[in-house]
Amino acid sequence: MWMHKKILLKLSGESLKGDSSYGIDPRTIKKIAWEIKEIKDLGVKIAIIVGAGNLWRGRTGEELGMDRSQADYMGMLGTIMNSLALQDALEQTNTITRVMTAFPVSSVAEPYIRRKAIRHLEKDRVVILGAGAGSPYFSTDTAAALRAAELNIDVILMAKNNIEGVYNKDPKKYQDAVLIKHIKHQQILSQRLAVMDITAASLCLENNIDILVFNMLKKGNIKKVVLKEGNIGTVISSKGE
């Protein structure tokens, strides 16, 4: 069976809220957990980074007049909350997990240590990485690219909330937006397509990390992407078309 053997799954915080406007939807997070278990049972080694858009948005901090660093740390704490919720949902499926955070939260998680994270993956534990990169001004997309490079993972599965992949323009604003099936990292950078921030895209380019952008809300899509079935979403790589 041809499939990705080792992945970093980047979940947007919004993917956890389902159809709700805020927070964590119990049915949605359970569905995600079972889909992760399904690919775990195929022998795939899995690291996960979760965003916090379901709990905290940077623009809220701006509206409050908050210091950018303070607002970013709130976002990092939100990712830890999401990581713990996902850990619990996964463990209800009898999937062994470890939550590791970029700064110490010793009562609830392990500190992120690269060699220890690699060891967890080798022992077939799902590693959930909280607190982003651990520093303000760096997005969870950048954290995903950084951790993928550190953990020798050559593909990031970027799960989106009801977005099929990368478009030539915003599909929410333009009905004639076209889904791009395959694109180069260089094009993401030069065209400034709204897939991820420039720092994350540059890291992936420099370290030959492919990115697969797909719709998380369609049941079975994670497995299809891992097994390279169905031509789902958008592939971003150094090879292009």
UniProtKB/Swiss-Prot annotation:
One GO term of the biological process aspect: 'de novo' CTP biosynthetic process
Gene name of this polypeptide: pyrH
The keyword tRNA-binding is annotated on this UniProt entry: no
Catalytic activity field: UMP + ATP = UDP + ADP
GO cellular-component term (any): cytoplasm
UniProt keyword annotation of NAD present: no
Record keywords: ATP-binding, Cytoplasm, Kinase, Nucleotide-binding, Pyrimidine biosynthesis, Transferase
Matching Pfam families: AA_kinase
UniProt subunit comment: Homohexamer.
Reported regulation of activity: Inhibited by UTP.
Function comment: Catalyzes the reversible phosphorylation of UMP to UDP.
Residues that hold UMP according to the record: D72, A133, G134, S135, P136, Y137, F138, S139, T140
An MF annotation (GO) of this entry: UMP kinase activity
Recorded family membership: Belongs to the UMP kinase family.
Catalytic class of the enzyme: transferase
InterPro entries named among the record's database cross-references: AceGlu_kinase-like_sf, Asp/Glu/Uridylate_kinase, Uridylate_kinase, Uridylate_kinase_bac
The protein's name in its UniProt record: Uridylate kinase
Intracellular or extracellular location(s): Cytoplasm
Domain of life: Bacteria
EC number annotated for this UniProt entry: 2.7.4.22
Entry binding sites for ATP: K10, L11, S12, G13, G53, R57, N161, Y167, D170
Pathways per UniProt: Pyrimidine metabolism; CTP biosynthesis via de novo pathway; UDP from UMP (UMPK route): step 1/1
